[in-house]
A protein has these predicted regions:
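Feature 14080 marks short, conserved micro-sites in well-ordered regions
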Residues: 1-174
C-alpha cells in the first residue's frame, strides 16, 4: 500500500519507522512539526512543534533508532540540531544547543553501540570528531577528535572507500 499523507504538509522529510509508525518532519504554513503516520490521512498527526523562531527546516535525517527512542538531525540556517523522540511530545527534545559545538557538525556515520548512538562527524573545517549520544542532553558529548577524511577534498570521480563495523561491542572504522 502507498502511504497517504496530506497534501497540506509541505517540505516533508522522511525519518523512518519506529514502534510501528513512520516519522517525518514537515511544515504547514510557517510552522514546522514532527509528524507520525500509520499510512492513512486519519492516522497522520503532529506530535511536536519545533521552535517558532525556526525559519525553515532545510533537511532532516534519521541517525539511529534505539529500543525506546529515535535520534535525528535537522538543519536550519546552516546549523545542525540533534533531536530525540520516543513518539510523544513530552519525549521529544533537542540534544544540542544552538551555537554549541554540535551545531557546526555534519554526521557522516551513525551506529548503535549497546544503548548509545555513536556519530562520526566533521565540522566546517573538515576536522573529524567522534560523538556519543545516550538519549539525554547530559549524555551527548564529544569522545575524541579523529582523523577522518573530508569527503569534499577528493576529486568527484574518485571513489573513497570507508567502512564502519561494530563487532562484539567495539566500533571499528577507517
Amino acid at each position: 500500500n502507498d502511504v497517504v499523507v496530506s497534501e497540506d504538509i509541505a517540505q516533508k522529510e522522511l525519518l523512518g519507522a519506529f514502534n510501528g509508525r513512520v516519522y517525518f518532519t514537515g511544515s504547514v504554513g510557517t510552522e514546522h512539526f514532527l509528524w507520525e503516520t500509520d499510512g492513512s490521512n486519519e492516522g497522520t498527526s503532529t506530535i511536536f512543534e519545533f521552535d517558532e523562531q525556526l525559519p525553515a527546516i532545510e533537511s532532516s535525517n534519521l541517525l539511529s533508532t534505539q529500543n525506546d527512542y529515535l535520534v535525528f538531525s535537522t538543519i536550519s540556517n546552516g546549523e545542525t540540531e540533534f533531536w530525540r523522540t520516543n513518539g510523544a511530545a513530552a519525549g521529544t527534545f533537542k540534544l544540542s544547543a544552538s551555537g554549541s559545538a554540535l551545531s557546526s557538525l555534519v554526521s557522516i556515520f551513525a551506529c548503535n553501540l549497546e544503548n548509545k548512538v555513536l556519530l562520526r562527524c566533521f565540522d566546517s573545517n573538515g576536522e573529524g570528531q567522534l560523538w556519543v549520544i545516550d538519549g539525554t542532553v547530559d549524555g551527548t558529548e564529544k569522545l575524541a577528535d579523529v582523523n577522518v577524511f573530508y569527503l569534499n577534498s577528493f576529486p568527484q570521480d574518485q571513489h573513497v572507500p570507508y567502512e564502519e563495523k561494530v563487532i562484539d561491542g567495539v566500533l571499528y572504522f577507517g
